[in-house]
Design a protein with these regions (language model features):
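Metal-dependent phosphohydrolase cores
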Residues: 1, 86, 152
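Conserved catalytic-core segment of nucleotide-activated headgroup transferases in glycan assembly
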Residues: 1-58
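Conserved active-site histidine-acidic residue motif and adjacent donor-binding/catalytic loop
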Residues: 32, 53-64, 76-78, 94
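A short acidic, amphipathic alpha-helical/loop segment
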Residues: 39-43, 63-64, 80, 84-86
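An anion/phosphate-binding loop that grips the pyrophosphate of nucleotide cofactors and donors
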Residues: 68
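Catalytic binding pocket for nucleotide-activated donors in carbohydrate/polymer assembly enzymes
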Residues: 77-142
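A short, well-ordered alpha-helix in the C-terminal region of glycosyltransferases
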Residues: 136-156
Length: 158
């Protein structure tokens, strides 16, 4: 995972000129519900330190998830994110499910990554909750992400 606002040096052309390019941490949003997607967009617009990409078609899902540092989504987007060892925050038709962790993975999986367990349709959530979960997501270890990916594969094969 990239560090927040990591700077990289790149050489262009024949000269020895070096240009610093700021690479923002990439968050990919894959939410089918238009109201929820709009709400997430409004909240993320307050957090300028992230590059935010939205999945708009199935054909680009794999590429965007692979390039992402963190996924916000529901259903197949969240499922794919876990499989690819990405931090995933579940936000779906049933509200704000929060960060998928080793402790919450099985509940989210059984709920098909649709939102908060026992959540209500289109329930509201705050920028503070989203921001807190984003920070927690970037603190997940590779081992934790790998473990959840392996569990997904195991459950898929049952």
């Amino acid at each position: 995972m990239k560090n927040l606002n990591e700077l990289s040096a790149t050489s262009f052309g024949k000269g020895s000129k070096l240009q610093l390019i700021e690479q923002k941490t990439c968050i990919v949003v894959g939410i089918a519900n238009s109201r929820t997607r709009l709400r997430i967009g409004v909240l993320l617009s307050e957090l300028s330190e992230y590059q935010v990409d939205y999945i708009s078609s199935e054909s680009e899902t794999g590429k965007l998830i692979e390039e992402a540092d963190l996924i916000i989504g529901a259903g197949i987007t969240a499922y794919e994110g876990v499989l690819r060892r990405k931090p995933v925050i579940v936000v779906g038709d049933y509200g704000f499910g929060g960060l998928v962790t080793p402790d919450t993975f099985r509940k989210h999986y059984n709920n098909r990554f649709r939102g908060r367990i026992n959540g209500a349709k289109e329930e509201s959530f705050s920028l503070e909750n989203l921001e807190r979960e984003i920070c927690k997501g970037f603190n997940l270890t590779f081992q934790e992400l790998q473990m959840m990916s392996n569990q997904t594969i195991t459950l898929q094969n049952i």
